[in-house]
UniProtKB/Swiss-Prot annotation:
InterPro entries: Ams1-like_N, Gal_mutarotase_sf_dom, GH38_C, Glyco_hydro/deAcase_b/a-brl, Glyco_hydro_38_C, Glyco_hydro_38_cen, Glyco_hydro_38_cen_sf, Glyco_hydro_38_N. It catalyses: Hydrolysis of terminal, non-reducing alpha-D-mannose residues in alpha-D-mannosides. This is Alpha-mannosidase. The modification N-acetylserine is found at S2. Binds 1 zinc ion per subunit. The keyword Acetylation applies. The active site is at D411. GO terms for biological process: cellular response to glucose starvation; cellular response to nitrogen starvation; mannose catabolic process; oligosaccharide catabolic process.
Length: 1083
């Protein structure tokens, strides 16, 4: 045996945990050994702010404390600042490192002048300017006013300097003094710190070592593979060993060792295309792709910042993405929300036309979604949701020549059961969200599926398995997207949405480089490392789903609403905004109704105000953004933007209606009649004395312990001791509708309850399950007295003192009713909460009813959603608080109770208890949310039999209560222009002029026609096939059933003359359950 056969140097098996943990040291810029590892070589040279090479001056835009932080003067246009500076009108002062800039929400402008060292210029290598002022900023070319790239403190700090022969650079930086997530004090979702300052940390020119920076990405992905791949894969262990081999090979005193390390990794673990877009063309083509990467940039239109700041976030984010597209040909980026595109066009037309439009034409930048904003779908009315698509899709068609095929709504708080139908009516057949991954009780069971609405319409739906729309393109993000797919038996691939989001930003160069490395590792090592594909479009991804699932027929189906098991408090937070939204929707309905009919009667002397109407709709739709209307924004959004905006909508609608009414009154000398905008309401004479002949009159009787209100149909007993309603009986039937003997509430109806409301986090968003059993009844009235006692109306006023400043005044009333309308008799309640000053309390009002059913019915947009009244399963438990619109109904076969309201959305029905949510008092992100005085109207409608069209129509009347005084002859003509007859459950909901009528001159017209038309929207309200007739005196030329966009014609219809009145044309229509239908009538 020779000495060579003797072991002199024994080897040990590496200890996995130790060797794995060691890998983090190599690229750690803040670790103890950063100067002995790769970070030492990230830069070849760096020069910080000095007087020879980098000079920076600053100018602070005037910002008076206490003034509106969203006024235009706080964010002056780029052009105005640069022109004024050129004229010497602005005083720019020299800036210094660590200098603070602020306060919160103010704007600071910087001028940057760079003179690169001669040897840097001669190198002809890529050079950088690195800027970090801890806030948001954007680089602006002073000659073209076109932005180049954006900065966000700590995340996006580098600007690639264009190559120049002399190394000279001059540009401006506009900086908004807020972080990417606003200015929250302590936590991002706390109320803002309005006195926050942002420090200039870096203003450096950098000569980077691109090899070292590339090795940083190589090693990062290799280390992630070592940490995150399954333990039974050889690729995991090889990654760990190679990582340690690289660290052993690296020499901190020899920069050339960087190249040697890269060469080792390319030989052993990556392919040769790891830095090229061609990497996605390599590998086994027969192997199915696990993960498809799509860049996106979710910009909340308002949230922890105002609309005014979002306008700047848009250009910052999208300019950065357009710059990246020039360097990464595979990069595809999607952005939604037509409102954001419109703001960009208004604020930066040069960028919109010269940069954005070409990127769209080159199929790198994609406008998706089809809605005006990424809207809430719980609270907006059905017509509002229809207009979200109408304006969104028409904007895209007008400016980009395309409409979206996908409803893009990754981040909203639940999805209405009518969304599939509204999407299909708007040219959309696909849907993407991921929010249900936030469910806090049940895990949603599907990733790819068909979502069917209550009418049967369905959308091909994908929920990215990575459970985020802001993936950083980490190895783990790709791995989770591949492994967390919940429907792999049907479709085994998933979409990964990568890019900084919520506050904007979007993908970074680093993310795109990481994805190239991950695909390179897959090309070399097989599918234990997921096969990642970048470069396809969202439409191509969905086409792949259809191809691999028998056109979607093999996929599972989810029917009904996509209820979000979280953020249930958003049905109630910011009550004033929700009330103004309801009022705005009603006023717009009335304006379109009266303006459309007036333009038909007087085409030569009255012009339909389409431009004003469209602008008002845009503002309403903007305020339906999924943080604004739900109530989860900071205070300034409501104080300075949304509330004033909605007040203005109501004011402008009222003004336009008044002008139209005055015009109509000038056209006739006939007596005036009062008209509503509901097709079943008939004109009433103005100031006509109420005739009580043939009516049940109202009366009030007082006793020692209680007060009785009665009108011959209903008898209502109010307890003087507690101030609540203890009995509601139908005297004609002998039926009691309340139950005070069983269940939790043995006191009575209109019982106010204050719940503790301390969710686990997310105050404005959440109310939690445990709060259901943590409550106190308000039982000691300060006053109970008769406030009205006439034959027309009787009422009792009840006052409760809640705190030293806060009191509740509730007026319970009963009106006289005609014998023929007695079945519609209801108990009206008007409640004023004065000086609501609670902290983390939730005010509700309860109604214990003598009803038993497993399900209750809640009005949703254009229909009904049924939900359980029991807690059988965890899915039932999760629905302890739900959303409704104008009514909730709880019925059994023989009788039922409907609760109507004029501005509330939260509700629950369990056991025998119906509960309407009134007010919350969260303290973040708005510290003053819902404080103050609130007026709320609701009603108890007891009825015989199950839910019927009586409830639907009463709820409409309860809300659409405005009356307009018109000459009698014109009023009759108004009624005859369009009406509906037939099945009572078919509702004629809206009337408007055709958008493409040339005479209308709409700014959203796409194909102007020299024709006149009105568009009529109807829907089936209760869930049954129905037949009705549209009746009109118009001299009809043709009739079309059209889509929501007024573009696609489904079919043509014919009209017949009414046999008893030949002036009337009757158009027979048939609707399936919960169908929404639009008809365009040409005349």
């Amino acid at each position: 045996m020779s000495s060579e056969d003797i072991i002199y140097d024994p080897q040990f098996k590496p200890v996995q945990g130790i060797y794995e943990n060691r890998l983090r040291q190599f690229i750690d810029t803040g670790g103890d050994y950063h100067d002995l590892n790769l970070p030492k070589f990230y830069d070849k040279k760096r020069i910080s702010l000095d007087h020879d090479h980098v000079k920076v001056w600053w100018y602070q835009v005037s910002f008076e404390r206490g003034s509106s932080p969203v006024s235009p003067d706080k964010r002056p246009s780029w052009k105005s600042i640069i022109e004024r500076d050129k004229k010497g009108e602005l005083e720019f002062r020299e800036a210094n490192i660590n200098q603070p800039f602020g306060p919160s929400w103010s704007t600071t402008w910087f001028k940057v002048k760079i003179s690169l060292p001669e040897d840097w210029v001669k190198s002809n290598e890529q050079l950088l300017f690195q800027w970090d002022c801890s806030n948001e900023g954007i680089v602006i070319d002073p000659k073209t006013l076109i932005p180049v790239t954006a900065f966000s403190g700590g995340e996006r700090t580098e600007y690639v300097l264009p190559k120049t022969s002399d190394g000279k650079h001059f540009f401006y930086i506009e900086a908004g003094n807020n972080g990417m997530f606003g200015c929250g004090a302590g936590s991002t979702i706390n109320p803002p710190d309005d006195n926050r300052f942002f420090h200039l940390r870096k203003a450096d020119i950098v000569w980077p070592d691109l090899d070292a920076r590339a090795l940083y990405i190589d090693f990062w992905m290799l280390g992630d593979a070592a940490r995150e791949l399954p333990g039974d894969s050889w690729q995991k262990h090889q990654a760990r060993q190679l990582g340690n081999a690289v660290m052993n090979l690296f020499d901190p005193n020899d920069r050339s060792s960087v190249r040697k390390c890269r060469e080792l990794l390319q030989r052993e673990y990556f392919d040769s295309f790891l830095e090229s877009s061609k990497v996605y063309e390599q590998g086994e083509s027969q192997v199915l792709t696990n993960v498809y990467g799509i860049g996106n940039c979710h910009i909340d239109t308002a949230w922890l910042w105002p609309f005014a700041e979002t306008r700047r976030k848009i250009v910052r984010s999208w300019s950065s993405q357009c710059t990246l597209m020039d360097r990464f040909p595979e990069y595809k980026f999607v952005a939604s929300q037509a409102q954001q595109f419109k703001w960009l066009l208004e604020d930066h037309p040069e960028f919109f036309n010269k940069v954005l439009i070409p990127k769209i034409q080159q199929s790198q930048f994609f406008a998706v979604g089809g809605t005006w904003v990424e809207n809430d779908t719980n609270i907006p009315s059905g017509e509002s949701l229809a207009r979200q698509f109408f304006f969104g899709q028409r904007f895209f068609l007008k400016h980009f020549g395309l409409k979206s095929k996908i409803f893009w709504l990754p981040d909203t708080f639940g999805y209405s059961s009518q969304m599939p139908q509204l999407c299909r009516l708007s040219g959309i057949d696909k849907f993407l969200t991921q929010k249900l991954s936030w469910n806090n009780i049940n895990s949603f069971p599907h990733s790819t599926f068909n979502w069917a609405g209550i009418d049967g319409s369905q959308l091909l739906t994908h929920m990215p398995p990575g459970n985020t729309y802001t993936a950083d393109s980490h190895f783990g993000d790709v791995l989770r997207t591949a492994k967390q797919n919940k429907t792999p038996e049907y479709y085994g691939s998933g979409l990964m949405l990568y890019g900084k989001g919520d506050g904007g930003g979007g993908p970074t160069e680093e993310m795109l480089q990481k994805m190239r490395r991950i695909r390179s590792m897959n090309n070399r090592n097989g599918n234990v490392i997921p096969k990642l594909q970048v470069g396809i479009t969202v439409d191509e991804f969905y086409d792949d789903i259809l191809k691999r699932t028998n056109q979607g027929h093999d996929l599972p189906t989810w029917s009904g609403e996509l209820y979000f098991e979280f953020h249930r408090g958003t049905y109630t937070s910011q009550a004033q905004t929700k009330k103004l939204m309801r009022l705005s929707e009603i006023k717009l309905h009335d304006l379109e109704w009266i303006a459309a009919k007036t333009s038909v009667l007087y085409p030569d002397s009255y012009k339909y105000p389409s431009k004003q109407i469209n602008e008002l709709w845009e503002n309403v739709l903007l305020c339906q953004f999924h943080d604004v209307l739900p109530g989860s924004c900071i205070e300034m959004v409501y104080k300075y933007e949304a509330v004033p905006m909605l007040h203005n909508v109501v004011k402008e609608c009222t003004s336009l209606i008044d002008k139209t009414v005055q015009f109509l009154q000038s056209q006739s000398k006939a007596d005036l009649v009062e008209m509503r905008t509901l097709t079943w309401s008939k004109p009433e004479k103005v100031s006509e004395e109420c005739s009580l002949n043939g009516s049940y009159t109202s009366s009030v009787t007082g006793y020692d312990d209680y007060i009785v209100l009665a009108n011959g149909k209903l008898k209502v007993i109010i307890c003087k001791k507690t101030g609540v309603i203890t009995s509601i009986t139908d005297e004609t039937l002998g039926v009691e509708y309340l139950d005070t003997e069983h269940g939790r509430n043995k006191l009575g109806a209109n019982q106010f309850v204050i719940y503790d409301d301390k969710p686990l986090g997310w105050q404005a968003w959440d109310t939690e399950l445990y709060s259901v059993n943590q409550y106190k009844y308000v039982t000691k009235p300060k006053k109970v007295q008769v406030s009205c006692n006439t034959k027309e109306k009787c009422a009792v006023e009840v006052i409760f003192q809640i705190s030293e400043k806060c009191k509740i005044k509730s007026v319970i009333s009963l009106n006289a009713t005609a014998v023929t309308d007695a079945k519609l008799s209801k108990v009206d309640i008007s409640t004023t909460v004065e000086n609501w000053d609670a902290r983390n309390k939730f005010l509700k009002v309860e109604f214990p009813v003598n009803i038993r059913n497993d399900f209750a019915s809640y009005e949703t947009q254009f229909g009904i959603t049924k939900r359980p009244t029991h807690y059988n399963t965890s899915w039932d438990v999760a629905k302890f608080e739900v959303c409704h619109h104008k009514f909730a109904d709880y019925s059994e076969y023989s009788k039922g109770v409907s609760i109507l309201n004029d501005c509330k959305y939260g509700f629950s029905t369990h056991g025998n208890l119906m509960r309407l949510s009134l007010l919350r008092s969260p303290k973040a992100p708005d510290a003053h949310a819902d404080m103050g005085t609130h007026e709320i109207k609701y009603a108890i409608y007891p009825h015989r039999g199950a839910l019927s069209s009586d409830t639907v129509k009463l709820a409409h009347e309860f809300n659409y209560c405005f009356k307009y005084k018109l000459p009698k002859d014109i009023g009759m003509n108004f009624d005859d222009i369009i009406s509906i007859s037939g099945d009572e459950n078919v509702i004629l909901s809206n009337i408007k002029r055709g958008e493409d009528d040339s005479a209308v001159k709409s700014n959203y017209s796409l194909n102007p026609r020299d024709e006149q038309s009105i568009v009529v929207r109807v829907y089936e309200s209760l869930g049954g096939e129905s037949f009705a007739s549209l009746n009109t005196t118009l001299n009809l030329k043709r009739i079309e059933k059209v889509d929501n966009l007024e573009m696609k014609v489904y079919k043509s219809l014919t009209a017949t003359r009414d046999e008893s009145n030949h002036a009337i044309n009757r158009i027979p229509i048939k609707l399936r359950p919960f169908e929404i239908a639009s008809f365009r009538l040409y005349f």
